[in-house]
């Protein structure tokens, strides 16, 4: 199923050092899904839900249910107490997965510690029938993520496969997808372009609307569907900024609409 994310509209929500005057909030994100005919919304760590009150959480779930929207939750920081807080929120809103980015700005556990933490938490996920989806995110190589998944050895722990992040670890998506697709339970569709800088000594990797970049989206969706375990494909955007935050948000909105229409044309 095709979905959008709080990282589809990153600028509209706000990034450190650049906050819009009227930032997008959860209800606004759901309204964008409704207006675009999207039935899955992944609400990630840039729009955290774990601090909502029980009443606010219930209202969110009821609103989403009434509109026919399935919610997914994303967290950042594989710290047991924080993961449990996010997991309880995922349970409360009916999310089938908890997408987790391992690192934070000041927390980068080594692989053995990551494995130990996930093994400790696995029974909590299993008892709630919620899957932990570990996102490939910059620092670790694909084989290290594979080692984590194989070492834990649980159907309740898999991969959230992002199409661009592993370039931060020096790996292209073909390599990463070949290794991690068998474990992928959630897919981030993030198209991209690569161009040389003007002096030719270096390259720049930037986002692009889905279908306008280098990512072979049709192929990755076909391969993901063949595994039988990947249940949602979530659109994310890396929208290069314009001169003002207002212009950037307009561009981001246009890219989102273009991307959704393209992805719908693929008959997900």
Feature names for model-found ranges:
Residues 8-10, 45-47, 77-79, 102-106, ...:
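Active-site-proximal loop/turn and secondary-structure-junction residues that shape catalytic pockets
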Residues 78, 236-247, 251:
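A short, acidic, flexible beta-alpha connecting loop/helix-capping segment that sits on the rim
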Residues 11-15, 106-108, 169, 241-246:
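A short acidic, helix-capping loop that chelates divalent metal ions and anchors anionic groups
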Residues 213-220, 227, 231-237, 241:
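H/E-rich (His + Asp/Glu) clusters that bind or coordinate divalent metals
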Residues 41, 120-214:
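Acidic/histidine-rich catalytic cores of soluble enzymes
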Residues 1-96, 154, 182, 222, ...:
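N-terminal pre-domain/capping segments
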Residues 3-7, 99, 182-195, 234-237:
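Non-cysteine beta-strand/loop elements that form the S-adenosyl-L-methionine
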Residues 31, 56, 61-159:
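Active-site acidic/histidine proton-transfer and metal-coordination neighborhood
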């Amino acid at each position: 199923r095709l979905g959008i994310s709080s990282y589809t509209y990153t600028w509209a929500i706000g990034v450190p050092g650049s906050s819009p005057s009227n930032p997008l909030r959860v209800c606004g994100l759901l309204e964008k899904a409704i207006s675009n005919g999207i039935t899955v919304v992944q609400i990630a760590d840039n729009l955290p839900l774990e601090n909502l009150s029980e009443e606010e959480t219930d209202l969110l779930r009821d609103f989403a249910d009434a509109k026919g929207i399935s919610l997914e939750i994303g967290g950042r920081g594989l710290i047991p107490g924080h993961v449990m807080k996010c997991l309880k929120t995922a349970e409360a809103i009916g999310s089938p997965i908890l997408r987790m980015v391992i690192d934070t700005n000041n927390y980068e556990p080594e692989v053995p510690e990551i494995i130990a933490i996930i093994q400790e938490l696995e029974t909590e996920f299993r008892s709630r029938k919620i899957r932990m989806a570990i996102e490939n995110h910059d620092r670790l190589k694909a084989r290290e993520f594979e080692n984590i998944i194989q070492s834990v050895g649980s159907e309740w722990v898999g991969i959230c496969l992002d199409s661009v992040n592993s370039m931060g670890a020096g790996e292209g998506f073909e390599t990463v997808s070949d290794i991690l697709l068998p474990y992928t339970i959630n897919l981030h569709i993030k198209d991209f372009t690569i161009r040389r800088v003007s002096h030719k000594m270096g390259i720049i990797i930037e986002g692009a609307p889905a279908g306008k970049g280098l990512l072979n989206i049709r192929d990755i969706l076909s391969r993901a569907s063949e595994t039988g375990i990947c249940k949602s494909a979530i659109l994310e955007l890396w929208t290069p900024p314009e001169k003002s935050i207002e212009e950037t948000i307009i561009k981001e909105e246009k890219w989102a609409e273009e991307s959704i229409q393209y992805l719908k044309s693929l008959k997900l």
